Amino acid sequence: MSRVRSGVTGHLARLMVAFAMVLSVCAQAAAAPDVTNPAVVEAFVDGVVKTNMQQHHSPSGVVAVMKGGEIIFSKGYGFIDVEKRTPVDPATSLFRPGSISKLFTWVSVMQQVERGKLDLDVDVNQYLKTFQIEDTWPGQPVTLRHILTHTGGFEDGGLGYLIIDNPDRIIPLAESLAKSQPVRVNPPGEHTAYSNWATALAGLIVANVSGVPFNDYVQQNIFDVLGMKYASFVEPLPPELDVHMAKAYGYKPDQYTEINYEIISNFGPAGAMAASAHDMTRFARALLNGGADGDNRILKAETLQQILDEGFVHDERVRGMALGFLERRFGPDGFDNFGHDGGTTVFLSHFGLSLQEDFMLFSSFSGPGGGMVHGAFVKAFYDEFFPREITVITPPADFAERAGRYAGTFNSWRSNFSKIESLMRALSGLKVTPLPDNTLMIGPKRYVEVDNNLFRQVDGYERVAFQQDADGKITGLVIDGMGVMQYYRAPFYETAAFTGILVGFSLLVFLGVFLRLGYQWAAYRALQGAEKMAFRASIAVAASNTLFLVFAGVGVSGGMTALMYEIPAVLKFSLIFPVLATLAALWHGVMSVTYWREGFGASVWARVRYSLVSLAALAMAWFYIYWNLLGFNYFS
């Protein structure tokens, strides 16, 4: 009797559990709007996009949503020509998807792998004709697999040469890559560091082994095959496509100002494409359908699967790289978003796919506020239509005992290490700070520990995995969904705080030299011999350092866009002064010895004050040397 009752009770319990699970699934389904309903999608997209475009001054944008091989929603926002009020047409209007162009380069590489002309695991130097990658790490050559996963070990770079706005500066791809070959700062296969140069190199390799210039190759083997009539890597655009191009605009108070078409031809395979939203759906349809859109095939199904299965990841608990494609964190478990984002100085774009949902989202927004619209829209769309449950996590009570091991500043391996732009590394570090509530502040967001060296955003699903060495010391971190952005733990002298203190202290010291010269002008003129020479050394140090900071400040005042297009002449001129300042620092150091030995100055404090000038001068000399400001090491 009791056994029967117990069995019935157990059966009822199991039914209740099953019923609860069904209700939970239904509730989740009900909570997610129907992404196959065009009216529902349009209402959401309009609500986010229109407001943000107006608020952030984005003159044009486009969104396309595809599911099950069918375009559910596509719509243009704003105007491709503001003056003529020409509206955006998602079928024909071209946008600049930036690094989404790389996916066409990776498909081209894998086509040549299919044809037996390329091997992912051999030294790429055997595919190069006019130059070779430097043998920085003997016995460790760079391979196409390294290039596809951004683990080639190259430093990053781009100021003054990656994107230009003058077609007269276009040079052949091989010449451009030879001229701008980056330093190999790491052995291949160890660290991820996004590389436009390496991607462009992959495009050159495709051209070399196929015997067809890269732009023509993509046109013949992808665009023509898929019927992508409104897509091109050619710069400037052919006239028949240029009339459909969303113009590039800046924004001054109350009006848009047209700017030149961005030229990326010198590194074209990394980002030179222009394409319409509907043409991007054709590309997506092939990727979601085993490499073919109907009878139009660009890859074998097994090759596409290889792209998705093989790649690189630093920590299996966070998403890393497929072969060229980024694995994204959007959507619930099983959604497995992959694709790429892309940005030029004018356009910000997203291209996301899910095989499980047979789904694609493409968006692109232009203008100075395009990035703000992009940031507000993309994640919000996935969270709306493909929500991910966010559970409340209580921070471990004992986390405070180990929180300090994570504290510090972390710099990206996607940085420059040999040229003037390396200084950006010191200004863009990711700061990690333990908080009293047993959480970590990583950048602007709070995270809670969920596993050993693994943290989840408190009010979101973003994850960060820290890395440690054999001794258990934290050495770096990787962010879920950003597989090409590995960070290393920065030494104190590579942080913004230290840099600010060093430069600020030196400026105060140099200001003191000028003030002292002003109120002791008569005493200065009365000085004789070595003592006057010592004072002149202080003037030389203060003047050369101050002039560098003044001219460099003017040189960068035009903003990052101007620096991307070309290094301004005034910034080039400013680089004379670090050389003079370093020589003056050495001179001042020698004179400081003389100052003490000869007993110059009215008191011991005067001699200490003079030594402080030497200290500031030598500190700035180190600053110039370490951050590659001593000389004219830039590409133009």
Regions flagged by a language model, labelled:
Residues 13-24:
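Bacterial N-terminal signal peptides
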Residues 46-49, 63, 69, 96-124, ...:
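Active-site SXXK
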Residues 35-95, 117-119, 126, 134, ...:
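Short, conserved catalytic-motif segment at the N-terminal edge
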Residues 350-367, 475-479:
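Short, well-ordered beta-strand elements
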Residues 95-98, 192-194:
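Catalytic tyrosine of NAD(P)H-dependent dehydrogenase/reductases that use a Tyr as the general acid/base
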Residues 30-32, 372-636:
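Peripheral terminal and inter-domain segments
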Residues 71, 77-81, 136-355, 368, ...:
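Short, surface-exposed loop or secondary-structure junction motifs
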Residues 1-11:
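N-terminal secretory signal peptides that target proteins for export/translocation
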